[in-house]
């Protein structure tokens, strides 16, 4: 009796045989359409980057203070802009967002400018004249968000002076005796940079006071400064160990008080790095961190 014919192969063997064929066909198709595959990959990468940038608002153009996320101000993000004009109320700056050629060609950017004020600085008339001379129309600059009040933004202004270096206009004005320090409006007491900002502004002002620059040429101005310092900054200096060691000895005598301030500021180092390359990197890191926690 003849036996039944042997099976030609098991189902698992057929399946294993088909898998290499499918992979080979896909690989062959990809080789035959290499340009199409590259274009698809590039398109997907660009789409992903565009979605990421839009989600953290890197490509958004801000035309008013209400457009800026509260988180940006809380994190003191640095933005780039172009000066339009200087008015009695402050500087009108057109925000320049990060743009991609594809996005820029497809959409129309909104028109408008931000009202920016020098944080912690009360400009003298000579200071306003100096700003008009120093800043040119359409000049590019960076502004670091420190606080907001109504439609005005209180910022650090940084202007490139060639190469990778920038000048902090807030501190430069005080250093030249072209204005006086005031509390930065909108900057929270619990902010990490609250004390650093005010300390640097005071240090710049004391430099002008010591050299008798600008408004500090007259002794009467120096005396009024000391009175103002006592009334307006006592709360800030309570946070410093200097006052803790001196206790109630808060003398406003010109020589002794100035020497105490001088010794105190010699301890501190200027932590503000005005390298524009570093500012660009810090802005990107700030926004990436904002995206991660959002």
From Swiss-Prot:
It comes from the Eukaryota. Keywords: Acetylation, Membrane, Secreted, Transmembrane, Transmembrane helix. SUPFAM superfamilies: Staphylococcal nuclease. The chain crosses the membrane at residues 40-56. The keyword Chaperone does not apply. The modification N-acetylalanine is found at residue 2. Highly expressed in ileocecal tissue and endometrium. This is Protein C3orf33. The gene is C3orf33.
């Amino acid at each position: 009796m003849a036996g039944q014919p042997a099976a030609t192969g098991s189902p698992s063997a057929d399946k294993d045989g088909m898998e290499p064929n499918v992979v080979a066909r896909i690989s062959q198709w990809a080789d035959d359409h290499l340009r199409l595959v590259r274009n698809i990959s590039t398109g997907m990468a660009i789409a992903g980057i565009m979605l990421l940038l839009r989600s953290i608002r890197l490509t958004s153009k801000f035309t008013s203070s209400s457009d800026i996320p509260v988180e940006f101000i809380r994190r003191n993000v640095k933005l780039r802009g172009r000066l339009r004009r200087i008015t009695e109320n402050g500087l009108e700056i057109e925000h320049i967002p990060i743009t991609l050629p594809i996005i820029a060609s497809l959409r129309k950017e909104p028109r408008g400018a931000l009202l920016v004020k020098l944080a912690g600085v009360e400009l003298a008339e000579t200071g306003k004249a100096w700003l008009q001379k120093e800043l040119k129309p359409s000049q590019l600059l960076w502004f670091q968000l420190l606080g907001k009040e109504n439609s005005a933004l209180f910022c650090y202004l940084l202007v490139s002076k060639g190469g990778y270096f920038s000048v902090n206009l807030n501190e430069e004005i005080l250093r030249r005796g072209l204005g006086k320090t005031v509390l930065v409006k909108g900057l929270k007491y619990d902010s990490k940079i609250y004390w650093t900002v005010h300390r640097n502004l005071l240090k710049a002002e004391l430099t002008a006071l010591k050299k008798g620059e600008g408004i500090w040429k007259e002794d009467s101005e120096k005396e009024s400064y000391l009175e103002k310092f006592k009334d307006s900054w006592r709360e800030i200096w309570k946070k410093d160990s200097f006052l803790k060691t001196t206790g109630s000895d808060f003398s406003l005598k010109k020589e002794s008080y100035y020497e105490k301030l001088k010794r105190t500021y010699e301890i501190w180092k200027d932590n503000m790095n005005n390298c524009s390359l570093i500012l660009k990197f810090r802005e990107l890191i700030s926004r990436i961190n904002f995206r991660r926690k959002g």
